[in-house]
């Protein structure tokens, strides 16, 4: 048992690093092809027409971003993927606070959604419509959508609401004890 735990602890950083590094099958290079890709990619999923389009900005090599987009599609969102070589200007334009970045940034219903945030939290945000910039989940917590672990492990994490002034406050807790 200790051998399995040791091996899991050793391999976890490698799995996390390669999850985001693998090329996404849904990568597109321009908004024109992004729209076509969004239609094709969501053809097998049931799209909830009441939900706004999720525009996901990511680098072309990020695989976990595509897995997170699949999570959104499964929750009823139509998703448009946009690849960019430099995410910093996107995050800056959308108001992601310093130190709160992740690998992808989405625009959903007038809000910024940064990182591997569960679709249920996004739906709650859209229902409650707070005066805020959006939601952030810094880093890439193990077990969050798009970062699922083979053993089902979920690292405790907190999704934060970004207020209009750029400050944050807890919005939702996930994982053991959350």
Model-derived features: where do they sit?
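Stable alpha-helical elements in mature extracytoplasmic
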Residues: 61, 68, 83-86, 118-122
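Bacterial signal peptide processing site
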Residues: 20-24
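Local sequence-structure signature of Cys/Sec-based thiol-disulfide redox active-site neighborhoods
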Residues: 47-69, 75
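Bacterial N-terminal signal peptides
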Residues: 8-17
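Conserved helix-turn-beta segment immediately C-terminal to the redox Cys motif
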Residues: 69-89
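Low-complexity, Pro/Thr/Ser/Glu-rich flexible segments characteristic
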Residues: 25-49
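Thiol/selenol-based redox catalytic cores and closely related redox-interacting motifs
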Residues: 93, 100-178
